[in-house]
Amino acid sequence: MFDYKLLSALAAVIEQAGFERAAQVLGLSQSAISQRIKLLEARVGQPVLVRVTPPAPTEIGRRLLNHVQQVRLLERDLQSLVPALDEEGLPERLRIALNADSLATWWAGAVGDFCAEHHLLLDLVVEDQTVGLKRMRAGEVAACVCASERPVAGARSLLLGAMRYRAMASPEFIVRHFPQGVRAEQLPRTPALVFGPDDFLQHRYLASLGVDGAFEHHLCPSSEGFIRLTEAGLGWGLVPELQVREQLERGLLLELLPDKPIDVPLYWHHWRNGGQLLGLLTEHLARLSAQWLVPWEQP
């Protein structure tokens, strides 16, 4: 039998990105958390954590985290059927990974009523849409929104739709860098904005225009900051259509190539044995996502 106090300590260290915060969340001393991790490692006969900053799970650690995540979800179902088992009486909580652009645009509208109706608290982890699935694979989250269709073992994926991005820049930037009009081959020689090192959307966009290779760019790991820097004329960027309607209407931003958007598919990944609440949320997102996302057409 598993000792779930030990597994909870492992989950807390990963979810809170360190021993100190894990101790605060569990109401224990940092040394007590460390002792539980050591005891767990002694019982499984191998390390469950890589001692880096932040700590990372080993292969067996990931398997244990997957187990903990699914047990938590099943326990929630049982507590809803037998309320007396819920000794703490706390609201439900789901840990979900999603990309910053979804969080900045459609996510709140899609889940707001659901969370209120089901007294659900969310623990959101922001990851680029191309790498969010690693959180599922590590057993750190109950579900994720990402651009990959293929689910991890033990999970399912559901196509929600696609986020449409358009290449935008300020009027001043366009006048300064494209006085004769915008041509695709000029884009690599003008400063761009990229969300982070895992963001390859600009590379895909340029490739779709027949332009390959390196390009000048700023890194800006903030969805809101990305828009502000684009408005300020620091570079051109691919921004969600949902996020810049007001800027377009006010003339703060202009589209570089109006007939050349790029769509990014968004899939909802969730554990196959995730329990009733996660199943209800999945059905809810399947019904509502089309209000914000465009249909995805495979290239």
UniProtKB/Swiss-Prot annotation:
Function recorded in the entry: Controls the transcription of genes involved in arginine and lysine metabolism.
Subunit-level organization: Homodimer.
The entry's DNA-binding region: 19-38
Gene Ontology molecular function: any one: DNA binding
Matching Pfam families: HTH_1 (PF00126), LysR_substrate (PF03466)
NCBIfam families xrefs: argP, PRK03635.1, PRK13348.1
Superkingdom per UniProt: Bacteria
Name of the protein described by the UniProt record: HTH-type transcriptional regulator ArgP
Species, as recorded: Pseudomonas fluorescens (strain ATCC BAA-477 / NRRL B-23932 / Pf-5)
Keywords of the record: DNA-binding, Transcription, Transcription regulation
Family per record: Belongs to the LysR transcriptional regulatory family.
